[in-house]
Amino acid sequence: MILLVRYNEILQLGFCMTTQQSSSELLISTSENRTALTTDVQSEHVNAAYAYLATLHSENSRKSMASKLNVFSRWAGFQDLRDCEWDRLRPEHILAFMASREKKGQRGSTSNCYLAALKGVAKSSWIAHGMNHEDYLRINALKQRRYYRLPTGRSLSYSESRALIENCDLETSIGARDKAILSLMLGCGLRRGEIPFLRLEDYEPKNRALTLVGKGDKERRVFLPQPVAESVNIWIEHFRGTEKGLLFGRIFKNGRISLGDPLDPSSVGRITKRRMEEANHEKATAHDLRRTFATRLLANQVDIVTVKKMMGHANIATTAMYDRRGDEAMQAAAEKAVL
């Protein structure tokens, strides 16, 4: 079987290959007895970092991991990930690098991201027959750092969320759009990175349902509470229109709505920040609206398995990290303990 993986997206991450390589394609040939990693360039050598980055589905993940691999490369004495000798990577190098970073105050979560990136490169090198099996196993055996930090972010109060929504003027296109966006994050738990790619044809007004592709390229169906559906319907019926395409788009100063000019996740973050400031509330991020959604479901006795599905999480442990009920929930639970 031949799997064809193009480097086009990887080349947009802020680094480049040689002219000869920039048009190359990565060919992964597999058979029962062996796995060979080659390119259409004359050299048989494959940069394991490029091969690893090609396996990542998210553009943000590729950018983040490429940045970390560049940091490691410079620490190891190379210019960047392009000329780092990845096939010679050993666990001792990784441990020394991690120790030097943590000595400067690097957090455990960041260390684990570096470790994941370097393990991924080691695996790509091993697949390409660059790194021997023993060295790969030694690197793969490195354990993640154990750490605990108090959870960041917060859950909005009901008065805050009401004021946030009511502050949007439905007489204007910007107000109607922003109310629909904020309602989807508060009432459906959507990520800010999911908002820009919602499409009208995936919305079912009669069923108050919306199908989307979220983090990790996972498709899920969300159901809109009545107030959320009303906000979305007002945006569509009074401003957006019913033509197929992106559900939300940019709105220019002259009032023109451009559905061919999508929002980006940072734009959704700025909308949240601006609306919170206009409502004179404590600072909150777009992700805090998602935390609010999960916290309220759990507070209303929705089982955590259902909440996990509604959030689009892969495991319950991730969902539990969104719980911001605080000491009040534990005090109420303590009253139910039976001696």
Where are the regions that the model predicts?
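Conserved catalytic core of the tyrosine transesterase superfamily
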Residues: I2-L339
